[in-house]
Curated annotation (Swiss-Prot):
Source organism of this protein record: Bacillus cereus (strain ATCC 10987 / NRS 248)
Catalytic activity: uridine(34) in tRNA + AH2 + O2 = 5-hydroxyuridine(34) in tRNA + A + H2O
Protein name: tRNA uridine(34) hydroxylase
Domain Rhodanese as annotated: residue spans: 127-221
GO terms classed as biological process: tRNA modification
InterPro entries: Rhodanese-like_dom, Rhodanese-like_dom_sf, Rhodanese_C, TrhO, TRHO_N
Amino acid sequence: MATTKPYRVLLYYMYTTIENPEEFAAEHLAFCNSLELKGRILVAKEGINGTCSGTVEQTEKYMEAMNNDPRFDGIVFKIDEADGHAFKKMHVRPRPELVTLRLEDDINPHEITGKYLEPKDFYEAMKQEDTVIIDARNDYEFDLGHFKGAIKPDIESFRELPDWIRENKEVLEGKKILTYCTGGIRCEKFSGWLVREGYEDVSQLHGGIVTYGKDPEVQGELWDGQCYVFDERIAVPVNQKEHVIVGKDYFTGEPCERYVNCANPECNKKILCSEENEAKYLRACSHECRVSPRNRYVIQHELTEEQVAAALEKIEAGK
């Protein structure tokens, strides 16, 4: 791989047995810190799910160590070049699950999962009739970008997906089901759950959106918008052939791909908005959040009560 930038961002996961996640997490954090990596890694008895950044040399050492650990034999790293770190700190945390589905009866992807489709096969499958494409991510991820024709489940988090499927059975019955997510980890369990629910033709995008966007053959075609990522980059491009903006400004509905968090820390909702509207609406999604005494935009910009009142008056006048 020809390297043109000094840093890399690694994205990876593996379902494998880790006997003592707490002990492993502590040791792994010390190892990552010794390499001066930054990122967020989740560890559970069922495996590991991580994304981290570092220099080319640091990430090479990390991948070498992981590949030399028999527990992670065959692990696949998705690699992005970067100009600098994509995280501020390094966290390695033990968790009950790698992805939070909270099923009554958990799914082991080694025992049951949907059929893996490589990018070219997934591309062809999306164009077939009687196919339903389900986005297995959160609503704010979908709003920034998704495959053409994909269904956006009316959910706020991944663990709500099984209930949504049960409530919308008529949309899926008798259809070929395609599922996708950012890197593939959510679909390993979700597609397996669909198979267990009795759906016969279930496939998943192998390696997720990130792999699809890098594939030299499909080049991200049939993807609109950008892909939401859980680091300081926030969004990465997918479609190498054309860039269609699907995100809409929370306040005006105009095309927008810039995410901010609502300035009220008790809300923290992710909203798409321009820099102009961020200033106009005090980076807040509602009147209640604008007048919150903890509004971070107001505090950060040291706005006076008079300035806040003037901003609120301007918003009211524009309605």
